[in-house]
Amino acid sequence: MMLYGAIFGCVEAAVTIAAAMSCRNPFVAPFDKRDVADEARRTFALALSDHLTLLKAFDGWRLARGCGSRAEREYIRDHFLSRQTLVMVEEMRKQFRGLLRDIGFIESSGGGGSGGGGYGYGRNNNNNSNSSSGGGRGGEGAGAGGAVEHSSNVNGGNIQLIKAVVCAGLYPNVAVAPAALCPSATGNAPGKGPKGGKGGGGGAGGGKTAGEVSLVGRKGAMFLHPMTVNFDKKELDSRYGVYHEVVKTSKVYVRDMTTVTPLMLALFGGSLQVHHEKQAITVDKWLHFRAERRAATLVKYLRVHMERLLLRKITHPQEDVSSNGRDIIQASNLQA
């Protein structure tokens, strides 16, 4: 995830999300205030993604902290956040950023911690943006660890690109929702669903929320945990989601999810097969998507080009491949 974030110019978001997944959830829910805490957490809901929601909450905390200790205390109190966990995420970010710098994937522009390539949420976030809850600082840099070079974070506000990078980091953890939950989504119709069933998704979906229907994972049925931002959604923008953690009780629950498109899965997922005669593509022999011949050929070309780009960056870390990354973003329409 972080390597792709550096290549495609959204390294700050990638590093923050990776750090947050390495720590416990910063949201707290006191037993006697669970409903209030849940409502506070949902004010950060962004782009049908728990990972972007965490990113937005963390970003808001850094902004509040910059306004003084009182503002920080009020922010943490009002949004039911753990300062200790947020500090842990910040420290983990510094470590991850240092590792990327050590292997040559990013450069320190020198100087202090402001004025670097910040990230914000001012565009391409038409799903539950809630900008009043702290998203979009836009100008803050890498903090005490040294400012990140602007080219490494030039696409820090591109929500779709960040979701694609999350997809790259979390695959093969994929959950498929019923088609009825995504009536207005485009490009979501598979040739046949996972397990070979018509449409996949394992539930009726019509009139129900995402938390009331079963999803299909590679190892069977699973359900959204009530803490996910998509739990009460009656419509999703895509049938497909990637997740980091599951918990098994009476059922298998997905603790976090980011909706992703078939294109993201085709570009950043597993083994890709193109079936021109069926006008379809298959990812890892279980995710099936319709694709016209021209589109399928383009996806295959972009996939090969992207894998070569990653290999080139790994073997020649000092080489600037940002222009190549921009070409892929433009060709795949992962633009803000």
Report the location of each language-model feature.
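Long C-terminal appendages of very large multidomain proteins
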Residues: Q279-A336
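Second RecA-like catalytic domain
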Residues: M1-A296, K300
